């Protein structure tokens, strides 16, 4: 779990912040999405993504590392079997934060943090590879033309 930063915290103490983030992560994995304040969602995201990465590895050591944070065995089982399986093709970006209207009562900025369950589109990967190939080809084309010109001048 990330060490709380110096300065203002989400709660009164570092221990309370760790417990609060652990509870929010448990709720996120249990329900798939939670509504909270924007600062809490931004602090929860790196923790949740790290836990999903550990769950994708799937061995006993990483299960024990996750159990340090999430103490509910049924949620850990769901994380390792269902959620990690859904995220197998995804290389990161397992969560999404969506801003919503401010909370009634204190007008605190609210947000929904949810797990991204849509499958990764292979089309995006192919497009990125094609763009990279065209950039490489474009960079090599002037070099090849310059080499041909110097070869002709040498003859």
From Swiss-Prot:
GO terms for molecular function: structural constituent of ribosome. Pfam families: Ribosomal_L17 (PF01196). One of its GO terms (biological process) is translation. It comes from the Bacteria. SUPFAM superfamilies: Prokaryotic ribosomal protein L17 (SSF64263). Keywords: Ribonucleoprotein, Ribosomal protein. One of its GO terms (cellular component) is cytosolic large ribosomal subunit. Part of the 50S ribosomal subunit. Contacts protein L32. Belongs to the bacterial ribosomal protein bL17 family. NCBIfam families: L17. This is Large ribosomal subunit protein bL17. It comes from Bifidobacterium adolescentis (strain ATCC 15703 / DSM 20083 / NCTC 11814 / E194a).
């Amino acid at each position: 779990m990330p060490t709380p930063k110096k300065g203002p915290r989400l709660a009164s103490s570092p221990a309370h912040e760790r417990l609060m983030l652990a509870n929010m992560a448990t709720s996120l994995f249990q329900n798939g999405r939670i509504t909270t304040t924007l600062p809490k969602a931004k602090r929860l995201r790196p923790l949740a993504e790290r836990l999903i990465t550990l769950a994708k590895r799937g061995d006993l050591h990483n299960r024990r590392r996750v159990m340090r944070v999430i103490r509910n065995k049924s949620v850990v089982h769901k994380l390792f079997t269902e959620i990690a399986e859904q995220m197998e093709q995804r290389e990161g970006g397992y969560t999404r934060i969506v801003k919503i209207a401010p909370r009634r009562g204190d007008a605190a900025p609210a947000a929904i943090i949810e797990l991204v369950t849509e499958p990764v589109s292979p089309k995006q990967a192919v497009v990125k590879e094609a763009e990279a190939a065209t950039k490489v080809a474009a960079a090599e084309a002037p070099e090849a033309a310059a080499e041909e010109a110097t070869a002709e001048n040498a003859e």
